[in-house]
Amino acid sequence: MGIAESTPDELPSDAEEQLRSGDQQLELSGRRLRRLPSAVCALSRLQKLYVSGTGLRELPEEIEELRELRILALDFNKLERLPDGLCRLPRLTRLYLGGNRLLALPADFAQLQSLRCLWIEGNFLRRFPRPLLRLVALQSLQMGDNRLRALPAELPRMTGLRGLWLYGNRFEEFPPALLRMGRLHILDLDRNRLGGFPDLHPLRALRVFSYDHNPVTGPPRVADTVFLVGEGAVERMAERDEPTPRPPPRRPARAFEDEEEEDLLIGGAGSRALGAPGGSFRALEAAPGLGT
């Protein structure tokens, strides 16, 4: 059976049935859509919109009409740019943009002041998008598998950040700004080009540090409460006086419900391991979160 394809301006035939559930959500994942049907933007009460793995190439400016939208999944598509209208969604808390072709984010992206969880892994970002620095409420930032070489000195402005995933980038030195991110719980620098680390004791809230697949000869100096993943980690943790902490999940799983803050740092398989979706990601179960 082939993937259903809708005409550009019409809602799929089953959309009305979905909306009648009263949950104000629309699942379009896995369909063949080059652009979002214009009728979707007329659903002014919509709160959850899933458009993953559809081949989507563009979004209309009219997406800003979805003023009640809280969750927007656009991952595994072919988006090269985002419209300014997407930046005018005042209630948006979760945005999934992984696996697209994005080189940058719009300057107005900083208007998304309700955003708490952003996945933008698997794109073509060479520089850290500066609009993100103004998202002080953002708690979970997934930027793995991009092309970053450095982080801005102003990164500590993101005082709400608790989980930062930077695996699969091109860092050759540990970014100095990270040493001033004292509220981070999870830091993932797998698969970079790091040859060493500074003393990481300044990261007092750190609970998980992953540095696997880097050209380092041993683990960094960290507090005994930090779970390490990488060369020499098992030996280092075995030397501790206290029992080795139970490892919290390192990679965030997809979660589409409006959980509390602690559930934004949930664990499980990252989206890069899932491949293009054939349907909804909502079937994935959320693991227990890491509290603040």
UniProtKB/Swiss-Prot annotation:
Keywords on record: Leucine-rich repeat, Repeat
Matching InterPro entries: Leu-rich_rpt, Leu-rich_rpt_typical-subtyp, LRR_dom_sf, LRR_domain-containing
LRR repeats: 22-43, 45-66, 68-90, 91-112, 114-136, 137-158, 160-181, 183-204, 205-226
Source organism per UniProt: Homo sapiens
Keyword Secreted: no
Database matches in Pfam families: LRR_8
Bias-annotated ranges (Acidic residues): 7-16
Protein name per its UniProtKB record: Leucine-rich repeat-containing protein 10B
Signal peptide residues on this chain, from the entry's feature table: none
Top-level division of the source organism's lineage: Eukaryota
SUPFAM superfamilies: L domain-like (SSF52058)
Keyword Repeat listed: yes
Region annotation (Disordered) ranges: 1-20, 236-261
Coiled coil: none
